[in-house]
Amino acid sequence: MTNIRKMHPLAKIINNSLIDLPAPSNISAWWNFGSLLAVCLALQILTGLFLAMHYTSDTTTAFSSVTHICRDVNYGWIIRYMHANGASMFFICLYMHVGRGLYYGSYTLMETWNIGIILLFTIMATAFMGYVLPWGQMSFWGATVITNLLSAVPYIGTNLVEWIWGGFSVDKATLTRFFAFHFILPFVASALVMVHLLFLHETGSNNPSGVSSDSDKIPFHPYYTIKDILGALLLILILMLLVMFSPDLLGDPDNYTPANPLSTPPHIKPEWYFLFAYAILRSIPNKLGGVLALLLSILTLAVIPLLHTSKQRGMMFRPISQFLFWLLVADLLTLTWIGGQPVEHPFIAIGQLASILYFTILLILMPIAGIIENYILKW
């Protein structure tokens, strides 16, 4: 058996990635989120596949088909709610995973980090298009507002929007193509995950101390496989509690009203996991400026490795940077709250301040903190 595991071309890849992989002996629960994301992706693809068997991507029947899934299909309701709330769990794990990378300086593994950013964009695009599919009020108006942002692109903006819509408004063509993209992108994400892991295994994992762990490695199996299984069970427990007891907790009541192009909802907002970016978008009065800020809110992650000034890798022994990191977390929570509020005083001012603070912490204060900490340690 050992020979097959180590000799067979396919089994060897799996063995070197999940069984005999040398892993640092001190990685904490913050390193669990990678495997949890894999569980989320598998769960989303599986539940999504079963939903696609019963869903119709036509404006006249899309809303009814989702209702049909919930009412008439055997266990359709549980599949639908696992898929909807699974997306929320996915983003919780994603943000924790990125946060871990920021805190412990995992962004120094440049290739892995950059593929991770592309993955983040892919999954955000997938989630946005998935939100359009039930064809409720918030689906329709969310699609209209977000796709309309592309009209801010100089010269080609209007043509670009109409090209994406497949017409002069969000309609049947838009829904059909969004369904097609929503179906294919998770598989693109799966391929990117493989590349992500490929680059990670080239260098080996980071660890909480930030120093090389080459002198102290342990096999991934059984030490971290058992830890990952525990994490996955906890994830599924939380997901199922959400699905069984409060499936609509994170959704929008407006999406239970069929899409109506003649009636605009009083407050158009995306799902909770996009609210921080939506708040940054809204905090700039200029359309093009808002769109650029929206893109930069995620793209800023790409320049983080270039702005690393500290001689230490992680923030474990850097109190000033730690303070700034948790200030950033609080700022993102504030932005998430603001994104769900109406555009009126005092929310506009709070959103603008929080947006400025977000970019200031990441691009200015954190590099300065690194320099100060080096100086304090006489480095």
Swiss-Prot record:
UniProt-annotated binding residues for a ubiquinone: H201
GO BP, sorted A to Z: mitochondrial electron transport, ubiquinol to cytochrome c
Pfam families attached to this UniProt entry: Cytochrom_B_C (PF00032), Cytochrome_B (PF00033)
Its membrane topology: Multi-pass membrane protein
Primary localization: mitochondrion
Binding residues annotated for heme b b566, in chain numbering: H97, H196
Matches recorded under CDD domains: cytochrome_b_C (cd00290), Cytochrome_b_N (cd00284)
Similarity field: Belongs to the cytochrome b family.
Function: Component of the ubiquinol-cytochrome c reductase complex (complex III or cytochrome b-c1 complex) that is part of the mitochondrial respiratory chain. The b-c1 complex mediates electron transfer from ubiquinol to cytochrome c. Contributes to the generation of a proton gradient across the mitochondrial membrane that is then used for ATP synthesis.
Protein name (Swiss-Prot/TrEMBL): Cytochrome b
